[in-house]
Amino acid sequence: MTDAAADDIAARRWPHATAPRRILAIRFQALGDTMITLPYLLGVRRRYPDAELHFLTREEVATVPKAMTQFDRVVALGGDRNRFRTWLSALRHTPALLARRYDVVLDLQNSRISNFVRRAIRPEAWSAFDRFSPRSAGERTRRTIAAAIGFDAGMDTALELRGGGPDIDALLLRYGWKAGFDLVVLNPAGFSPARAWPTASYIEFARLWIERHPRSQIVLLLMPSKRAKATEISIALGEHCIDLTGRADQLEAFAIVGRARFVLSEDSGLMHMAWTQGTPTLALFSDSRRDWSAPQGSWSDCLDSSDLPCGPCGLPVCKFGDNRCLTRYPAAQVLERAEKLARAHLA
């Protein structure tokens, strides 16, 4: 069968009525991009329960995939973000990947490295990620998978960790969780100043939420670089806040947002950890493109800047100096959207 475009995605479709024996999915971008693939690949696992499903990713984002029950094998490339070292790692792994004789390769990265690996291991069927169309990353992932296997595997958010995952109860209790209280995750983690909703707005949102839902506690799962912001929120909220900044690893953070009643987040990997598990998630976007990066599913929503002449700008610092695309949303309005999502999820 010759290479062909399948539904406008570069692909060679699986030609057999029987199921493939061994499938390799490739994704080694940032943490959030990797998280997005998980519910769609679980859809593949549900469709082909007897096939081996392997995942090729990078070491720095491999912790969660390695703990997932849906993968039979996870291969992690080294090299951090150094292109040369990543190439060397890919070259070292390619002979072993070739020896496994994959029937299908789902190249959900579509980079020079992933294209090299895909071509080198010579699968009978394959597809390459649509990198540029104005669709969400989740939708492009779904369509890329369908182009290779010939059907829509859908999205399944019932992601499972081996052995039930880490003991997050012990971690939460150690830092002030009141057993039985709902967890509400606030994540002011945008990597640039332009992505930041005001810290005072997060504090006001938290106070309003707790006033209406007193059996709730706020959880912070920020990186150490955001410690000053976390400290300000934690001091303001007192016993109502569980500050796990720098204290929870990737797997623990994944498990906590999976249990949370609600997540409010700027554009970040944690935001994608949340919606991909079916947790009600409200994203706050400023410079980010909603059509590419917004959370998916009826349990998610996104407040973004696409209705403004200046947005989404892609700039690290607001050219007006006031982050007006985010500051226009008062805490009470955000709370209203948040409660709507949380109520719909419970219903």
Walk through the language-model features, giving the residues of each.
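Catalytic machinery of carbohydrate-active enzymes
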Residues: 1-347
